[in-house]
């Protein structure tokens, strides 16, 4: 009874939010529903085969790829509704998850993005069939706290779900530690471009030694497991000699790793590997990320990065033939107000490309670029920064609120 009341209240709140022009209303609907019935997430998850996706970077992309791959199992129902419940907007905390499940109540499958800190209690509520563990590294310094504490919390949370299949990235030391003792693990070599936060063993505190792609702890029986899935430049290798083509619309080595884990998750639920890989390859844009827009006659591609590991990966995606690169950094609360992480990022030299430091913290960024030996100019407003670049292709790399605000300005026509 309380659950039905919560759902009706959520529907009314969402409608009112849309009417008032305050977005799609899903978050406010989820918040109100949980206030009325805190057990609603558990109720909505019953009867669904659910995949949870978590990690510091790549959650939204991998969730979108997983949803596409799971769609090959069920298609749509007679009313044309998706067979997979998932978030469209990356809202990965309780209210957003409830909103996604509410919007797809009849779906037999779910691909749910979950914030790392929320994974244990979300798993307790939804009893997932599969959990995808992507990577674990420092996020904003003033948000997530000590990374080894997070690893221990996730390890304890997963121990409560021995029947769940963990799709774990064996190239990430901290993720491996989370899954190492679990009885049902599928290991994927998805890559790890960031090892700064895993130089010591999370179990013994002793050093981690790297020998090529293999790693091991000097102080405990803890080493890189042998992967069942491995991603290549254009192929995906799986169990029993399986090798299938992997052609992605999204750029970068990290996205190939994301696709590998998404495919492995879908296969764990019975999907055909080749069909799952083809479906994952159709994902092109996630909440504005990777999209290309025209701004003042310049073809502008939008990239988002939120922490040192994400910045390092995004910088590797920059097209060296671009005529301009705008790097926009804000320092608002959602970004993390401590920008000392800028000094952990290895900024490249972009010969022949005009680099522009932008955003509310453009001056801090400019200092870092100067010490990195990157020639640049400073134009605080991101739209003006794009306009300052020579005509042609411009790459924009921005942190969370800078990316959000620039997208909003583009949607309102400020850059037309």
Question: What is each of the regions a protein language model found here?
Answer:
Residues 101, 147-148, 197-208, 387-395:
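Short, surface-exposed amphipathic charged segments that create phosphate/polyanion-binding patches used
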Residues 66, 70, 97-101, 259-269, ...:
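Buried hydrophobic packing segments
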